[in-house]
Design a protein with these regions (language model features):
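Electropositive polyanion-binding surfaces
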Residues: 1-251, 255
Length: 255
């Protein structure tokens, strides 16, 4: 395990030196028990164990992509243009900067040929480590088997057709997963009216500020308060005032 951790750390360092954009934002896990009790867990995605698994997975996907690229085989390659702006270097960003940096990332692109993935700092990338859950990963593994003479090779046209057929449905799945998590998070907060919690100011709008509740890593609006000037990255205390999960409403006030 120690050796694997050293390999993972060196690989991450190499990616960062190649311009990777490392986003370090806590993950919020919403768990619904059989009795409909909702539990919220805040997970550190940068714990040693999670970092090791993440980096080794990225390495495996990169090595697979490099093999396919070297052998000039079509595959579902992922690339990503440079972000619209960089807010920090390597892993130096604050929670505010990491959250805002994620908003500035360019959308990833799926193609049959390898191109640079700026977000990961790699010259080629595919996903291949979850063939049971993800069809794209299964297609990648089939291409590897084809390279070994174990089954027919997908042509570039067939790969492109797969991308066109599944890209939109997969995008819809991601939106549904986000909406489901936010719904149950708000459902939990419906029972926390009057709770005080810390928030970070993200931006100012005409009639309110956009803030993120640190404990729950979710955004909401904070009404402007007379005589109080808030700037992005300010830390404030707010009180949960009203929540309606079905209508996607979360209201808070200062104090």
């Amino acid at each position: 395990v120690v050796i694997l951790r050293e390999i993972a750390e060196k690989f991450r360092r190499r990616r960062l030196e190649s311009g990777a954009v490392q986003i370090n934002v806590p993950e919020i896990n919403v768990w619904l028990a059989d009795d409909r009790t909702i539990t919220i867990n805040r997970i550190n995605r940068e714990s040693p164990g999670r970092m090791l698994v993440s980096e080794i997975m990225i390495m495996a996907n990169w090595l697979t992509a490099r093999f396919l690229k070297t052998n000039r085989m079509p595959a579902i390659f992922r690339s990503q243009p440079a972000p619209r702006e960089r807010l920090y270097k390597e892993e130096e960003g604050t929670l505010f900067q990491n959250w805002m940096q994620r908003k500035l990332l360019s959308r990833f692109v799926l193609n049959t040929v390898a191109e640079h993935h700026t977000g990961l700092g790699l010259n080629a990338y595919v996903t291949a480590t979850s063939p049971i859950r993800k069809y794209f990963d299964l297609v990648t593994q089939r291409q590897i088997r084809a390279a070994l003479g174990l089954e027919p090779l997908y042509t570039a046209e067939e790969i492109d057709q797969i991308i066109q057929s599944l890209e939109q449905p997969m995008g819809n799945i991601a939106k549904t997963q986000y909406a489901r998590q936010r719904y149950w998070l708000l459902k939990y907060l419906e029972g926390q009216i009057g709770m005080k919690t810390e928030a970070i100011v993200l931006a100012k709008r005409r009639n309110n500020h956009v803030i993120i509740l640190k404990e729950f890593m979710t955004e909401c609006r904070l009404p402007l308060s007379a005589g109080i000037k808030l700037k992005p990255e300010y830390l404030v205390q707010v009180t949960v005032q009203h929540v309606d999960a079905r209508r996607d409403l979360l209201s808070v006030f200062m104090g």
